[in-house]
Amino acid sequence: CVMRREKKIEIRVCKTKDNRFTVDDFAALADERTRIIVMSTLEWCNGWASDMKAIGDFCQEKGIFLVVDAVQQLGVTKIDTKECHFDLLVAGGHKWLNSPYGTGVLYVNKNSLSKIKQSYAGYLNTTVPEGGWGAYWENPAAPSVHDWTFPETARKYEIGGTSNYTGAIALGESLGLVNEIGIENIQEHIWELSAYCMDQLEAIGATIITHRDPGRRGGIVIARLYDDLDVDRWVLKQLHARKIFIAQRFTDYVGGFRISCQYFNNHADIDAMAA
């Protein structure tokens, strides 16, 4: 690991127990030297949605930074950044927000802004000069070297150079659609559909890895059909040939078939997959 090798940072990995994390698992690894917990709000290889409020409360009590990747949850279920005491939340837009690659969002807690330095400087993340950038570039006396300052907002963490404007427009439209449908409506639909998916998979003999706990899952359902990985790969190819696109995902031997139940999917889609 680069951070471990070059920055001399000790990294402790929290392993799942019965395909889940709890706040106690993280607490058992933390001590007075722990500075930051970095984790996914919803795991990509087993579908587990952690109790982020409990973990956030623990981090706030111990003075530990909490940084989360919400790429598998944003656009699926509600996330309360303040209630969970997130210092940073990041998420790509290309998954459950159905946006182009190279798009995403960053949330930074206001109380954390002064503690996190930006990595680079560019005209899009520095303080806008008087009159705006257009007037600045048109000024013959504009210096080539300037003592730039940064705004005390999350904008100072922008890349600084040319932005992905077309991708941002698409991301904005996608977020607008999510808000139009309502995240509560999406959440209820996906919870019901993912439960139906698990029922149908169990009916054909699959082993379900994802937990059924209410509130502890999103749209990801992980299942295994056979003990032979090559046979499962053959099944995957047959589904793809029928234009039914699921995936196989593993990490540390945890995983299986990954079925993503989106807000635009329905029971007929699940029935076609399980047929």
Where are the language model's segments positioned?
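Active-site phosphate-binding strand-loop segment of PLP-dependent enzymes
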Residues: 18-71, 75, 96
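Active-site PLP attachment segment
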Residues: 84-139
